[in-house]
Amino acid sequence: MTDTTSEQTERKLLDELYADFEDAGLIPLWTQVDGLMPMSPQPAAVPHLWRWAELLPIAQRSGELVPVGRGGERRAMALSNPGFPGLPYATPTLWTAIQYLGPREVAPSHRHSQGAFRFVVEGEGVWTNVDGDAVAMRRGDLLLTPSWAFHEHQNVTDEPMAWLDGLDIPLVSKLDAGFFEFGPDELSTRETPERSRGERLWGHPGLRPIGRPDQPNSPLNAYRWEHTDAALTAQLELEQEGVPGVLEPGHAGVRFSNPTTGRDALVTMRTEMRRLRAGTRTAPVRTVGSAIWQVFEGEAVARVGDKVFEIAKGDLFVVPSWCEVSLSARTQVDLFRFSDEPVYEALGLARTSRGEHK
């Protein structure tokens, strides 16, 4: 038997073996290992920028043409990462959208397995009712809608309002853990209190009601801008006095936490606010897991991987897993950031790499 004949025979036997693999529902590891176990994360998501000046007019046009009601439920426009063409996903685990509610409109009640939050860049006049607790939405506020809580929104003014929604939809979808249920057609409450019941019970710094147990998601349903602003201001002032507290020179940051556990406000998403003093440039950082940033106020330059984004109020950009990110503040700039880091920490997969200031 010649070498060529031997090779042909071996090839035929291998082809038959692989055909049997396919028939048996098997895939050999030796043909897949590079894709299954890369040397470092190879995210499908790509760095991308969405400009508020472009998003808001589209939201306004949608408000004129698309009604809110059963079926669509929400007038929300999801950010679609170019790495996931045709899918409403910003990252493999995070979904974010601009939601727009017109004057006197109501978004009906429903609930779902996915956890959610609202972050308000501008405007006021909408109350979100979470399990019957009316929560005012104002500029700079973070509002929580934990998993499986009934929620609805009502605009009590003659002006429209837009805000940022963040949910863990892609994660819950991949885990095959999603449930959804419609709520009553009528609003659970038309009250418009200055402070929600959740704030009255849980919104006292360093104090918690003894009679209430720990909860996986924060029972404090509103984190008000006045407190966030004061905390960031104090960090930068104390830095000037030589008191440690900032992340790095000129870079203050706070994390929204669950008052019953001290951990993240939501079990699957980390929510933070950052403030950079004008002229500050942050050190490059890489983190396992993805993040989405939105400029609340000010102007900066964001370097994400090999992309450079000029960013201003309302602009959003995505940082894929293990993609280097750094910021340069042209003015004092405040940025809201949310990520999937709690998931990776719970799984023991979290990793962060910090570079040197350039």
Curated annotation (Swiss-Prot):
Residues 99-165 form the Cupin type-2 domain. InterPro entries: Cupin_2, GDO-like, RmlC-like_jellyroll, RmlC_Cupin_sf. Residues 187-202 have a biased composition (Basic and acidic residues). GO terms for biological process: catabolic process. Induction: By salicylate. It comes from the Bacteria. Its EC number is 1.13.11.4. Disruption phenotype: Cells lacking this gene accumulate gentisate. Residues 185-215 are annotated as: Disordered. Keywords: Aromatic hydrocarbons catabolism, Dioxygenase, Oxidoreductase. It catalyses: 2,5-dihydroxybenzoate + O2 = 3-maleylpyruvate + H(+). One of its GO terms (molecular function) is gentisate 1,2-dioxygenase activity. Involved in the degradation of salicylate via a pathway involving coenzyme A derivative. Catalyzes the oxygen-dependent ring fission of gentisate between the carboxyl and proximal hydroxyl groups at positions 1 and 2 of the aromatic ring to form maleylpyruvate. The substrate specificity is strong, since salicylate, catechol, protocatechuic acid, homogenetisate, 2,3-dihydroxybenzoate or 5-aminosalicylate cannot substitute for gentisate in the ring cleavage reaction. Belongs to the gentisate 1,2-dioxygenase family. This is Gentisate 1,2-dioxygenase. It comes from Streptomyces sp. The lineage of its organism: Bacteria, Bacillati, Actinomycetota, Actinomycetes, Kitasatosporales. The gene is sdgD.
